[in-house]
A protein has these predicted regions:
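Metal- or metallocofactor-binding catalytic centers and their adjacent structured scaffolds
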Residues: 1-39
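Shared catalytic-loop signature of beta/alpha-barrel
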Residues: 3, 14, 168, 174, ...
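N-terminal amphipathic alpha-helix/helix-capping segment at the start of soluble metabolic enzymes
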Residues: 8, 41-55, 301
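Predominant activation on well-ordered alpha-helical scaffold segments within soluble catalytic domains
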Residues: 24, 28, 32-33, 44, ...
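Conserved, mostly hydrophobic/aromatic
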Residues: 27, 40, 101, 153, ...
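Proline-centered loop/turn at the N-terminus of a beta-strand
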Residues: 42, 56, 149, 198, ...
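Metal-dependent enolase-superfamily TIM-barrel catalytic cores that perform enediolate-based chemistry
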Residues: 54-191
Length: 337
C-alpha cells in the first residue's frame, strides 16, 4: 500500500495538492478498504487494532444548513427566524444526545442567512458583525448550558485583525475552539497568542509537509485533518506528526457517511483524537446511499467492526440523485443587522 501511495505521489509531485492529491486520496483510501475486506477485517485492524471503539461527535453546521437550505433538509426542521429559534436549536442539540456543536456566523431572519466573505471589502470586520456573532454564541450558550461544548467556524472570512477581534468578543463563552482557515502559520500564531480561546485550523492543508510549518510554531491547539482530501495513508502520517508536537486532531467530516466511516477508522487507529465532526441536518436520502446505517448513540459514533470501512455505496440509490447545478447560496455579503 505504501508503495502504491508513493508511486502516485511521485507522478503528481509537480502538481502538489489540489485535485491531484484529492484523486490520490480517494484511490489510496479505496485500496485500504479493498485490502481489509479481502482479509475479512475492519480497516483499523491493519494498524494493530482499535485504540477506541467509539468516538465523541459534534453537531456541525448547526443552524448553517437551516439558513442556507431550508427547503432541502430531512424532517423539515424549523426555520431560524428569531434568536429564540436559535435557542430552540441549541435545546434540540441537547435533547438528541449531543454534547458539542459547531456553528457559523448565522443570522436569523426572514430569510435567515450566514455572514460570508463573498465580495468587495467583506473580509473586513465591523461592529454589526461583532454584535451578530456575540448574540449568536451567547444565545447558544444560554440554551445548551455550561456542559455542552460550542465551536465557531470563521473559515477564511476575515484577515488576522478581524479574527482577533472576534476571538476577543467570544472569550466569555468558554468555546471549545474558534476555527480559522489561513495558509500563513505566523498569522495563525499571532491570533492564537492574542486570545484565551483555543484555535483549530488546517482543514484545507495537504500532507504532513503542509502541516509541518504550523506544527513547528505550535500555531494551533487542534489540527483539522480532511481524510477524503489527504487519504488514509497521509492522514495517519499527519496525526503522527501532530502527536510529536502534542497537538490533538479532529477529522474534517462534513461530507457523506462514507467520509464518516473513513474518519471513524482514523479515530480508531491513532491516539490523539479530540472529537469528530458530523453533519446532522442533511438531505432526506443521505442514509440510503450506503449499505449499513451509522450507529450513533448519546452523541458518540460506535465505530463499525465490519470488514473494511464497514459499508459499501448503494450505487442504485446514488444513481437516483444525479448532481445538478443548484441555486446560489444566500451567504449575506451585506452586513449583519
Amino acid at each position: 500500500m505504501e508503495k502504491l501511495y508513493w508511486d502516485m505521489y511521485r507522478l503528481t509531485v509537480m502538481d502538489f495538492g489540489g485535485v491531484a492529491h484529492k484523486a490520490i486520496a480517494g484511490i489510496d483510501t479505496a485500496l485500504w478498504d479493498i485490502k481489509a475486506k479481502a482479509l475479512g477485517v475492519p480497516l483499523y485492524e491493519l494498524f494493530g487494532g482499535p485504540l477506541r471503539d467509539k468516538v465523541r461527535l459534534y453537531w456541525s453546521h448547526c443552524g448553517t444548513y437551516r439558513a442556507w437550505f431550508p427547503d432541502h433538509l430531512a424532517g423539515n426542521p424549523p426555520s431560524l427566524r428569531t434568536m429564540e429559534d436559535i435557542a430552540n436549536l441549541g435545546r434540540e442539540v441537547v435533547s438528541r444526545g449531543f454534547t458539542a456543536l459547531k456553528t457559523n456566523m448565522v443570522v436569523p431572519g426572514e430569510p435567515a442567512r450566514v455572514i460570508w466573505a463573498t465580495e468587495g471589502n467583506s473580509l473586513n470586520i465591523d461592529h454589526d458583525i461583532l454584535e451578530a456573532v456575540e448574540r449568536l454564541i451567547s444565545t447558544f450558550r444560554q440554551a445548551v448550558g455550561d456542559k455542552v461544548d460550542i465551536c465557531l467556524d470563521l473559515n477564511f472570512n476575515f484577515k488576522t485583525e478581524g479574527f482577533i477581534r472576534i476571538a476577543k468578543a467570544v472569550e466569555p463563552y468558554n468555546l471549545m475552539w474558534l476555527e480559522i482557515d489561513t495558509y500563513d502559520p505566523q498569522a495563525l500564531l499571532q491570533i492564537k497568542q492574542s486570545t484565551s480561546v483555543p484555535i483549530c485550523s488546517a482543514e484545507t492543508l495537504f500532507t504532513s509537509k503542509g502541516y509541518k510549518p504550523f506544527f513547528e510554531l505550535h500555531a494551533m491547539d487542534v489540527a483539522m485533518v480532511d481524510v477524503p482530501w489527504n487519504g488514509f495513508t497521509e492522514s495517519r502520517r499527519i496525526a503522527a506528526l501532530a502527536d510529536i508536537y502534542e497537538i490533538p486532531i479532529s477529522p474534517h467530516n462534513y461530507y457523506s457517511h462514507l467520509s464518516t466511516l473513513m474518519s471513524a477508522h482514523l479515530c480508531a487507529s491513532v491516539p490523539n483524537i479530540r472529537i469528530m465532526e458530523i453533519d446532522v441536518d442533511s438531505v432526506p436520502w443521505k442514509d440510503d446511499i450506503i449499505t449499513e446505517p451509522l450507529d450513533i448513540k448519546d452523541g458518540y459514533l460506535n465505530i463499525p467492526n465490519r470488514p473494511g470501512l464497514g459499508a459499501d455505496l448503494n450505487e442504485k440509490e446514488i444513481a437516483k440523485h444525479p448532481w445538478h447545478m443548484g441555486r446560489k447560496i444566500e451567504t449575506a455579503p451585506q452586513r449583519a443587522r
